[in-house]
Amino acid sequence: MSAFLDKLSGSQCVSLEKCGDVVVSTNDCMIALYCHFCRDLFTQLPEFLRHLQGAHSDVLHFTKEHNVYSVEELMSGEQDDAQEDAHSAGHNSSSGDSRIPAKSEDSRAIDASEDNSDNSPVKSEQKGMQNEINLLAEVTNILLQSKEREHINNESKPENGGFNGPCKKASSESNSLRICDLKSHTIARTSRKRMSMLKNRILRVIDSDVSAKREMKPSEPNYILPITETIQEDNIPKICFETQPKPIPSSSNLSVRKSSLSEPNVSLACTNYAAKKTTLTIPKLLNCTPKSNLPCQQSQVYSDSNGRSETYHISKATSQGSKEMESFPVKITQIDVLPPLILPETSTTPNQKERVNALVENNTVNLYTAQNLPKEKPKKFFKKRGELWMKSEDSPSKSVKITKYRGNPIIVKRVQTSSAKSSPCKTQIRSNDKTKCFASEFNSTKIRKLKMENSIALKKEDPCSNKSIRLSKMATISSCEILKVVGLPAITDQKLEDTLLLDELETMRKKADQFSKIYKKYDSIWNYRKIFPPGKPEFISQKMFALTREVNETMGCNLANSAIKSIINQISVWHYNIYTKCIVLDTISETARHTLKLFSFLPVSFAYFCKCCDDIFTLNEDYTRHLVSQQARYQCTKCIKAFKYRGHFEKHLQNVHP
């Protein structure tokens, strides 16, 4: 390139002048042209050339005015190149497989050439070449259309010649159709078989249902079937009054032997009677001849054990107006064997039972209106609900006292003598319906439940209110004592310094000044939220240990790490409350102003440091929740370390303080 530029500069026709530099930005992948005259950047070459011609023509002395290509001219040149490429691609892609794409590319190239032919400043020779190209494109389109028609006609007519492709396809299609026909035939046959099987099953079920409905259920011994058919008069025999009347049954005939009514015999007799009545009387019901209303009727009971029958004669007596049954036939339908009675150990007389039942009924009826009665003082020993202790005839140690009030129901009171403690037997009677007996106590139990719920809710909020108050008082006392060591008791109790003497006040303020100077050095602790990124908990714990060591050495005290953390938390909370509550400085006491001046370097935002562990919290809610979870039951007196479990505390004593 340098040799080419030397040749151009060496000739007299060409004069080159350096107008700018090419600037490249690697981040944005952009190229720009830098103008030396006005120090501007241009992203496009035509803009840069127009700028030089318009703004710096006095320096450069352009000989020609229009020596810069316009955008339209550049686009027309690019379109001509595209047309030539498309035309060459169309000729190259004129094979049998790519007919349609070639056609589309040629048509697009022709359309583009026709559209841009008017605007492009091309010479006459180029126009002639374009006309020839257009003619060739039209001829190729006509040939392609004719070939497509022939191809469609050839596909519609099956060929028997040497072209094997379509024949194979046709044969494969026919084979596939035959296989499909076979499959459909087998599917239809199997489906017919399944449907016939289902049909047979359904018919069997229907037949079984019909036969089950036709079967008559066995009738009970007392059941009488209604006569549906009419009785013919010819079949009814005439009444013969010449027959001798049968004798009236005696009491011996009506009695039933106990031997014949044993449990297995009676059960068998009942079952046989029901079975025979259903099997024998049903088919003969329509053909039976009605008998006259004789004064006696017979009923037989069959038994399989001894094979003998017993007859029961029942007489009917007719009255003047209507016939009434004076005696009924003895029919045993069911015999149940009851379990043996379990009698209580204490014997009760019938008179005693009647008295007790009467008293219990009176108590259940009248306890509904007993709510307004004056309540007695509760005794030390209470009995269970629903228990009434009455006086028995055998044991004179117990007595019942019944008191009546005006317009009030009877109330049973229990009075026990001194000898009642020695008496071993007690009669205990419970009421059957406890809900009725103790309806008066329902409201009291409801109120008791509400009180219990309220107490449970209070326990959830504050599990031990008195204990928490005592602990809070102890915590304030301990925090005051810890703050006195540092000289800052005014944070918790502002009136405390008013009671001190001047010498004590001066010593306290000196201690506070010393502590503030030491604390100011550790900005990673008091400025935890402002530092970015914040320090790690391990680093801050190391700083906290260093702070405690320095405070103990300079101030001559023996404070633990947890005590220093509590002091820092109290100072930061006190400082935050003063600045957020918008307190006027004139209303604050002198001690508060003095402490504010000492800790003026503290920011408003702060962090909470846990006493038991190295966790740090920025929100008060999270800190309090963590404190509740970290409540310690055991604390070492030597190192003031807290432990939640006794085993951990004992291990600490064995390992650390042997």
Swiss-Prot record:
InterPro entries per UniProt: Znf_C2H2_type
Biased composition (Polar residues): 118-127
Organism in which the protein naturally occurs: Drosophila erecta (Fruit fly)
Similarity remark: Belongs to the Teflon family.
GO cellular component: autosome; nucleus
Gene Ontology molecular function, alphabetical: zinc ion binding
Name this protein carries in UniProt: Protein teflon
Zinc finger (C2H2-type): 33-56, 608-630, 634-657
Annotated region described as Disordered, given as residue ranges: 78-127, 151-175
Annotated gene: tef
Gene Ontology biological-process annotations: male meiosis chromosome separation; male meiosis I
Miscellaneous: Drosophilid specific gene duplication generates rgr and tef. Teflon has a function unique to Drosophilids.
Keywords: Cell cycle, Chromosome, Chromosome partition, Meiosis, Metal-binding, Nucleus, Repeat, Zinc, Zinc-finger
Localisation per UniProt entry: Nucleus; Chromosome
Function: Specifically required in males for proper segregation of autosomal bivalents at meiosis I. Expression is required in the male germ line prior to spermatocyte stage S4. May have a role as a bridging molecule maintaining adhesion to hold autosome bivalents together via heterochromatic connections.
Principal location class: nucleus
SS bond partners: none
Chain ranges passing through the membrane: none
Residue stretches of biased makeup (Basic and acidic residues): 100-111
